Every structure is written in structure tokens, then in C-alpha cells.
């Protein structure tokens, strides 16, 4: 059987036809056009998915299901998206809307969750039963795979790992709490620390790298200087890794996965991040004499959303 996988982002919708092994047979995309409202976007999601089959030369008779990954939360009990900030969606009945365009079963989940599923089917965690996917971008997102299946919890929020508190009474988070993990382990955290550094040391190499414009600092700027041995950026990066490892340790204690996969923008520095995490993690895991999760880098990158969404329908 074949599956339609659809990756919905704030800027584009990507669809692919995927086989049982997670191979993409055909894919194409279109702009999201969020400003048109959810009805028009969902119509395009459906039409793009269905046209993917037609353009691939395959038949709809071969397709078992449609899977959709969204940058928000999906309530599996009701078929409603309670909120999805990037799409400006609130209480959107996506399953009912999709029924206007197809009789195929439709499955929807968070985009980080489907990326984790993709890695467990076709990527670095393939062959494992229990794995976690952690995406390090503007915030921190996650996907939980237990016994080879997506685990989203009773209310669809089991993978909102970025909002577990790792620093009691810490920095305020956009969610309203203080001390959330993503305030310390995201790309945004590196940018914030870089801006503080430049404000305190206007002549530092980081300030020179961005031509004196603090607003232009990126996580990559900070990491690049750390990789080149700049003392201040090394300090920032080491502190970042510490907070990342604290959160990973909590996840290991709760889920005991075989593999934790790191994705997102920060992970693009590759072995520099991976080696730092692997070096520090043994100091914080609880059972130091027993095996614990190995940490790896995501391998599927841009195709993970399509593959993982498609695999939602395989279960």
C-alpha cells in the first residue's frame, strides 16, 4: 500500500506519496497562504495530496491513508486542532474539513512528532522500538515514539517537552510559565546570550561578526565562534549544552528510550554539538552503571515531515 504524507508549514505545504518502507515516490508543494483562513488552507492540503497521487502515475486504489503534520497541537479525541500559532488556527475541525474532499482515513499530529516517527522508520533511529526526537529551533519541540508508535498522550500534548520546567523560577516563557526548557535549550537561547555578551562587551568578536548590529546575531554566529575557540562564545555554548543535557536527562528518566535524535537548526553544527552532549550526559544520568539512550543527529532533514506524516496512516 501507499500513503500520502503532507507537511504543513507557515510558508509552504509539502506533499509526497510514500511507500510502506518510507520511500518518497513523488512529491511537490504549494504556498500555504495562511491569510486566507483555515478553510482555504485545508482545501489546498487535500487537493495537493490527491494531486500528488495523480501526478505520480499511481492510482488512488493503492492509497491507504493520508497523514498530516502541523506546527501545533492535535486533539486526537475530537479531531480538532486547539491551536496552531504559525497557521493562526484555533479550534479548527481539520478531520471534518478533510472529509469534504476525501473518503480516505486522515491522521494528523504535531510536526516534531511526525519527524520523530520518520526517523524511527527511515532514519537514524530505524530498528528501535522506543525513541525520542528533539528539535532545537526557535523553541524546543519533540516527538515520542513508544513501542514503534507515536505517543501523544491522552490530550495530544505528550510531546510538548520544551515546556517542562528545568529551572524553577527561571526566565519567563511565552507560555506564561517560568523556567521552561526551551528558554535555555533553543536557538533563541543562544541568540539571547549572544546579545547579552555584545551589550557587555561591545568590542567582542561576536559584535564584529555582525557588524555592530546586535539584532542580526544568529545561533550560528555564536556556535561558529565557539567552534573557533572564542572564549566568550565557548562559555555560552557550554552553558547551552549543560541546559540541553539537563532536559535530556529528564527525558531519559521518564521514557528510557533507546535513542534520542537531535534535529532543528542548532543540530546543524553536527559533531560539535553531538560530542559535547555525549561528553556531559554520563555525569547526569541516574543509573550510571546501566545502559542509557544514545544520542544521534537527525538524518532525514527536509523530507522528515512528509515521511513521518505518511507513516501516521500505516499503524
Where are these regions (language model features)?
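Conserved A3 ("GATE") glycine/threonine-rich loop of ANL adenylate-forming enzymes
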Residues: 11, 114, 138-141, 161, ...
Amino acid at each position: 500500500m501507499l500513503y500520502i504524507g503532507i507537511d504543513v508549514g507557515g510558508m509552504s505545504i509539502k506533499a509526497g506519496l510514500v511507500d510502506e518502507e518510507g520511500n518518497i515516490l513523488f512529491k511537490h508543494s504549494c504556498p500555504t497562504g495562511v491569510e486566507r483562513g483555515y478553510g482555504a488552507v485545508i482545501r489546498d492540503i487535500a487537493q495537493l495530496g490527491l494531486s500528488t497521487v495523480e501526478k505520480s502515475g499511481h492510482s488512488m486504489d493503492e492509497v491507504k491513508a493520508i497523514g498530516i503534520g502541523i506546527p501545533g497541537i492535535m486533539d486526537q479525541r475530537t479531531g480538532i486542532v486547539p491551536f496552531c500559532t504559525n497557521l493562526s488556527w484555533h479550534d479548527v475541525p481539520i478531520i471534518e474539513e478533510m472529509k469534504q474532499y476525501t473518503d480516505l482515513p486522515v491522521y494528523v499530529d504535531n510536526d516534531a512528532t511526525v519527524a520523530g516517527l520518520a526517523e524511527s522508520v527511515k532514519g537514524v533511529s530505524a530498528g528501535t522500538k522506543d525513541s525520542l526526537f528533539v528539535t532545537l529551533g526557535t523553541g524546543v519541540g519533540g516527538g515520542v515514539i513508544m513501542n514503534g508508535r507515536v505517543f501523544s498522550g491522552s490530550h495530544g500534548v505528550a510531546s510538548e517537552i520544551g515546556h517542562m520546567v528545568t529551572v524553577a523560577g527561571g526566565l519567563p516563557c511565552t507560555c506564561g510559565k517560568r523556567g521552561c526548557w526551551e528558554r535555555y535549550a533553543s536557538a533563541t537561547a543562544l541568540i539571547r546570550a549572544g546579545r547579552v555578551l555584545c551589550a557587555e562587551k561591545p568590542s567582542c568578536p561576536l559584535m564584529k561578526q555582525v557588524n555592530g548590529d546586535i539584532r542580526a546575531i544568529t545561533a550560528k554566529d555564536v556556535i561558529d565562534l565557539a567552534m573557533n575557540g572564542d572564549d566568550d562564545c565557548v562559555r555560552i555554548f557550554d552553558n547551552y549544552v549543560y541546559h540541553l543535557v539537563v532536559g535530556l536527562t529528564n527525558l531519559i528518566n521518564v521514557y528510557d528510550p533507546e535513542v534520542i535524535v537531535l534535529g532543528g537548526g542548532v543540530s546543524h553544527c553536527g559533531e560539535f554539538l553531538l560530542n559535547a552532549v555525549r561528553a556531559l550526559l554520563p555525569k547526569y544520568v541516574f543509573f550510571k552503571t546501566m545502559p542509557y539512550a544514545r544520542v544521534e543527529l537527525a538524518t532525514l532533514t527536509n523530507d522528515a515531515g512528509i515521511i513521518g506524516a505518511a507513516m501516521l496512516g500505516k499503524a
